Amino acid sequence: MKMERLERATIEAEMAGLAGWALNDAASSISKTFKFANFVEAFGFMTEAAIRAEKLNHHPEWFNVYSRVDVTLNTHDAGGLTELDFKLAKAMEKAAARRGV
């Protein structure tokens, strides 16, 4: 199923429900840095997020150093943000919350 790029108004409405996420200037990606208590918590978050990403068939761009995980989401095929990006961001928020973040 081809995902359609979201309109700016829809993106802004979705962003209102995502604390700490930043929208890039072109409104083509969102990003957030998650900070955990330690590496084990960060890796647990990444594992849970990876399982959800596989189920969605939508994969993040991310970078991990010790307790920090930097995440950027967009849909390359659509040339911007789609519903999948916000589904994955919300799943990541739940995974982080389970770890006290």
Curated annotation (Swiss-Prot):
Alphabetical list of NCBIfam families matching this protein: PRK00823.1-2, PRK00823.1-3
InterPro entries (alphabetical): PCD_sf (IPR036428), Pterin_deHydtase (IPR001533)
Q: Which family does it belong to?
A: Belongs to the pterin-4-alpha-carbinolamine dehydratase family.
Pfam families xrefs = Pterin_4a
CDD domains referenced in this protein's UniProt entry, alphabetically: PCD_DCoH_subfamily_b
Give EC number(s), comma-separated.
4.2.1.96
> Which GO terms of type biological process are on file?
tetrahydrobiopterin biosynthetic process
Protein name per its UniProtKB record: Putative pterin-4-alpha-carbinolamine dehydratase
Enzyme class comes to lyase
Q: Cystine bridges: which residues?
A: none
Q: Which GO terms describe its molecular function?
A: 4-alpha-hydroxytetrahydrobiopterin dehydratase activity
Which reaction is the catalytic activity of this chain? Answer: (4aS,6R)-4a-hydroxy-L-erythro-5,6,7,8-tetrahydrobiopterin = (6R)-L-erythro-6,7-dihydrobiopterin + H2O
Q: Which UniProt keywords apply?
A: Lyase
Q: Which domain of life is it from?
A: Bacteria
